[in-house]
Amino acid sequence: MGHRRWPRVAAAVAGVLVTAAAAAAFLNSAPHVQDRGDRFFVVEKGESLSSIAGRLDDEGYIRSPAFLLAAARLRRTEGSFKAGWYRVPPGSTTLAVHDLLVSGSQSLVKLTIPEGWTISRVAALVEERGIAPAADFEAAARSRALAADLAVPAATLEGFLYPDTYFVPAPFPAETLVSMMVETFFERLEKVEPGWRRLGGGGLLEKVILASIVEREYQLTEEAPLIASVFVNRMRLGIGLESCATIAYIITEIQHLPHPEYITLEDKGIDSPYNTYKWAALPPGPIANPGRVALDAAFHPARTDYLYFVLRDPDAGKHYFSKDLDAHNKAKKLYLKK
């Protein structure tokens, strides 16, 4: 009788093994939602494996977090998942995702954004580096809805795209890159002025607008707070800022013309709310994306009585500062070429 039961036991065991193999194959297979093309998954620094597995499941990269956890235990890779941005190809199995996150293979592109660049210049560089189309980047950076989502008190994200060096995969979603730059802005702002939230949205925007103008005017770090003080003093007295940088912004970013070699009297008469020669107020928005020096100067301007400045040493980037118009006119005659 015992010998007669062996075929049935063997068949039962085989059935269990086949079922287990089928279940494992199913749990390892890619979810159907991955048919949308390459997507990006972020492993945060110090994130636990259970958190990673849970998010992979929530975001539709894997079918079962338990299967990933079991695979990691069997392979002894629980502590080997590396932080970073990962491009997950469509159709990736759970084990393929596991191997990708353990390998740390990200193929990142270095993107360095200089201080004082505008949205359009950044967009062109993003496309040049093969990261995202310029049109997509501009659309995201000028999206009022995205600005609201990121708690930016402005119609666009001009001024809030922090100039820094970023490492991202290529290609990379433009909206995600823009969001990353804005998040970096607020991280850096916290170091510049921890109490910035007390300003409210309008107060913060004014500071960023001022910083963007300072960014386009200063050349020496030590002069940035002095230049900021000139603009603050003029605003307090109700005098127009008379910044050539705002005119250049109108010409290049609004009129889409080449950057002028110099600003003419005709240019200073352009009818635009960004014209600080025509209107005694800040422009309606930032004219560039300021860096740490300009932001610090806008939040902490020097205490001076200066109302004017003129470039006195183009090679060194030094300016001469004056307290009244008479002294300023004398400085212009002395330092500016006729």
Predicted regions span which residues?
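N-terminal type II signal-anchor transmembrane helix
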Residues: 2-38
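Short low-complexity stretches enriched in small and charged residues
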Residues: 7-11, 38-43, 79, 117-121, ...
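N-terminal start-of-chain detector that recognizes signal peptides
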Residues: 11-15, 59-60, 83-85, 137-140, ...
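Pocket-edge positions in alpha/beta enzyme catalytic cores
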Residues: 15, 41-44, 89, 287, ...
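Hydrophobic core
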Residues: 18-19, 52, 213
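Signal peptide-directed extracytoplasmic domains
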Residues: 24-191
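Bacterial extracytoplasmic/cell-wall-associated proteins, especially those involved in peptidoglycan
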Residues: 125, 131-132, 146-338
